[in-house]
Amino acid sequence: MDIFGVLSLIGGLAIFLYGMDLLGEGLTGASGGKLEKILEKLTSNPLKAVLLGAGVTAVIQSSSATTVMVVGFVNSGIMKLSQAVGVIMGANIGTTITSWILSLTGIESSNIFISLLKPTSFSPVLAAVGIVFLMFLKKDSLKNPGKIMIGFALLMYGMDAMSSSVAPLAEVPQFASILTAFSNPVLGMLAGMLFTAIIQSSSASVGILQALCSTGILSYATALPIIMGQNIGTCVTALLSSIGATKNGKRAAIIHLYFNVIGTVTFMIVFYALNAVIHFSFLNLTAQEFGIAVIHTAFNIITTAYLLPLRKVLEKLAYATIKLDDDEKRIMDSRSGNEFALLDDRFLEAPSLAVEHCKQVINKMADISRESLFISMSLIGGYDEEQALRVGELETRADKYEDALGTYIMKISTKNLKKEDSEMLNVMLHCIGDFERISDHACNLCDSARELQQKNMQFSPKAETELDILSSAVREAVDISFDAFKSNNKNEADKVEPLEELIDTLAVELKARHIRRLREGKCTIELGFAHSDILNNLERVADHCSNIAVDVIQSDQLEFDAHEYLDRIKNKDNQQFARDYKTYKEKYRLPETRSFK
């Protein structure tokens, strides 16, 4: 094998790996990220966990990626460690789908119809059609099939290139000697483990082994222990991803390692013990692509079958290796100790899932802002220091949420996103600022309430009634806009602007009335300043509610002018706006109406 053969092998491996990645990307895109979301909501049924782990891995074409995702789920507390065991086992089964696809390259027949099943016969056509889909179609839903076709074609082309490059090795005696040495179970297992750990893909490692079948000197006696070692080598990716994870996240990676090590060692002990008695004749046969796929699948199904009932033992081993300390127990029991666990970098490899997690976290942020605002509004009528401290705590949390979400959204935005995910990400990026500012205004209202209490000032009954009416309108604006954001309901979002317009009108009227009371000597200047601050903050809250509603409405529009939209809906010819405004005007009518229009 000369230098050109080595370069051909490296090039074939590169194309093979890229094809596998593109195929997985297309399949993941076609699934719409639904499998990852189902995986997140996994039930405790172990058989379902295995099947789901196998299904997800078959789609994304990587057991390592599935296991890394599981580490992330366990790390964030979404998935219990006991649930993770079944998924990890299923991932080992799902990864064998690649070897079955590659086994098609071994089809040999003079029958034209059977020959058409060989990938080299139809891969060029798939590649051509895939390029058309990818380059000339704009919808992501149509581009994904293109990625699948091109990925499959590249996978086959890479496999063919590797097979062609290693075929001359059949004439090299030294290579035959190396393969013979690897028929030693321990050496073969170590070789498979080391190579897979380096390239971090058991599917690619098995694919290269299938490519070696073209030499005609690879026997099943050599292939079998190498396949066993490949299953251990693939654990490296999950172990690396667990660095920096919580102890529970590390335990998930350890379970993956224990499952593969125990499964491999016990399988090899039993198999070679039986071989000493029965003498399996197939071991001396020349290995074929199809046979390697069978061994790879059978091994993973058998090990899963006898270790699944022992899943509790694997869990205990993980806890014995990484012990549960007092600090971890305290964190697990804490309600707020893991607020941003969903924003785990491991989920960035499944962008749709990462976007969904962002939405869940920002919904919590919205609840925090709403709670802080409603508490502060209640303090104006009756100040309570404990509740005021609560507002400060909530505002601090809202600031942390803004920082964490902003950073994570920026990370997601660098990924290849679906159109709807990109739109949702844009809405969230705009809205986190509004949610944070609302919590700031809540603190301002709290300060005004504290000032009233410290200076022993009190509004007149009429002023209190007017503020209660305005506060009720603001509460409804907050409820409608926040709920519209959570449900992405554009019809609900449309109701915010008429209410915000009314709130502005009410604020102007309340200021005018208060000035009149000042002139009549019914109110002090100092109390007037506090009244003005409260009105300004309530008005600003309504403005942020309007911003949130507009973001929801424009979420699926590439070109959207917010100012043009607001001018259009406020137009006197907009009957729906006029009807909604009239409804709110009746609902929040002030006691005195002589100057209110």
Predicted regions: what they are:
Residues 1-7, 109-121, 175-180, 221, ...:
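Interfacial loop-to-helix junctions that mark the boundaries of transmembrane helices
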Residues 1-46, 145-194, 212-215:
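Helix-loop-helix hairpins and the membrane-proximal interhelical loops
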Residues 8-21, 53-57, 125-137, 150-162, ...:
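Hydrophobic core segments of alpha-helical transmembrane domains in multi-pass membrane transport
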Residues 24-28, 57-65, 166-167, 195-204, ...:
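Short helix-coil transition sites and intra-membrane helix breaks within transmembrane domains
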Residues 33, 37, 41, 45, ...:
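Alpha-helical transmembrane segments of multi-pass membrane proteins, especially transporters
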Residues 59-66, 85-102, 119-126, 155, ...:
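Membrane-embedded alpha-helical segments of transport systems
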Residues 69-91, 99-121, 196-233, 242-248, ...:
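Membrane-interfacial helix-loop connectors
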Residues 79, 105, 218, 244-250, ...:
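Cytosolic, long alpha-helical scaffolding segments
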